[in-house]
Swiss-Prot record:
Compartments, record wording: Cytoplasm; Endoplasmic reticulum; Golgi apparatus; Membrane
Superkingdom classification of source: Eukaryota
Its membrane topology: Multi-pass membrane protein
Official protein name in the record: UPF0494 membrane protein PB2B2.07c
Keywords per UniProt: Cytoplasm, Endoplasmic reticulum, Golgi apparatus, Membrane, Transmembrane, Transmembrane helix
Pfam families tied to this protein: DUF999
Family, similarity comment: Belongs to the UPF0494 family.
Ranges annotated as spanning the membrane: 98-118, 144-164, 179-199
A GO cellular component annotation in the UniProt record: membrane
Length: 250
């Protein structure tokens, strides 16, 4: 004689709950998922085409964008330097160099954000890190804080004065700890003095770089000398205007 329970199990379709006779979709979906995960069921070509290749193309686009940006930066900088400062001399008597540096830093922060979407990326990260109740405040103050941090980091990095003052403080602290450390501090002070002799050059090189990045951000092109119109009112690092036509006549 056949067992009634075994006969019932044979009659009931798979995927149905025996007690309530409702379809158990969880087991069916699990079985399908396991079936699709088998190595012979995975289409590697579709996986590469739909997932891996788009991500790789996106990374390549970002890399090419950065390379193009840097290439244009140094190309335009070379044209500007060779045309306006053929002998390499730069005036250091300008009192506007610090305001100009701050203004250029502000402009370059927006230029970097425009080209590489720094603010949007960091804003998403900040918004996801905050609790839902604080999301309104993070959307307002998040971009402001990002811009301020970018400006401070850029200003400190380009001025190159912050490491100098920090080293001087370290030297003063070392000189008070003993004779041996005082000798090391004196040696470090000599190195700092040597670096201080070149700080003006570093400062004005940062002026050049900032000026050229702003030109690139505003889509301004520096043409050769044959195009005098582009150079009629070219601003210099002294806050003046350089007239190529007057310069050629003189």
């Amino acid at each position: 004689m056949s067992n009634p329970e075994s006969a019932k199990k044979q009659v009931d379709p798979p995927g149905y709950n025996e007690l309530f006779m409702v379809r158990d979709t969880r087991n069916v979906d699990l079985e399908r998922g396991l079936e699709l995960c088998k190595p012979e069921k995975v289409n590697k070509q579709n996986l590469f085409t739909n997932i891996i290749k788009p991500q790789k193309d996106k990374i390549n686009i970002k890399t090419d964008k950065i390379k193009f940006f840097l290439n244009n930066l140094f190309t335009e900088f070379s044209k500007f330097h060779d045309s306006c400062y053929p002998d390499g001399r730069i005036s250091t008597r300008s009192k506007l160099r610090w305001p100009l540096l701050i203004i250029w830093c502000i402009l370059i922060v927006f230029a970097i954000d425009k080209n590489f979407e720094v603010k949007d990326f960091l804003s998403i990260w900040i918004n996801e890190s905050f609790i839902n109740e604080n999301r309104f405040y993070s959307e307002i103050w998040g971009p402001i804080a990002i811009y301020i941090c970018l400006f401070i980091l850029l200003l400190l990095g380009l001025i190159c004065m912050f490491p100098l003052h920090l080293c001087r403080v370290c030297v003063l602290a070392l000189r008070e700890t003993g004779m041996i450390i005082a000798v090391l501090g004196a040696a470090l002070g000599m190195i700092i003095a040597a670096l201080g002799a070149t700080i003006t050059g570093l400062l004005y090189f940062s002026h050049w770089a900032l000026y050229k990045v702003v030109i690139l951000a505003l889509d301004l092109k520096i043409e050769p000398f044959k195009d005098e119109i582009a150079f009629l009112t070219l601003p210099t690092h002294n806050g003046e205007t350089l007239s190529i036509r007057d310069n050629n006549q003189s």
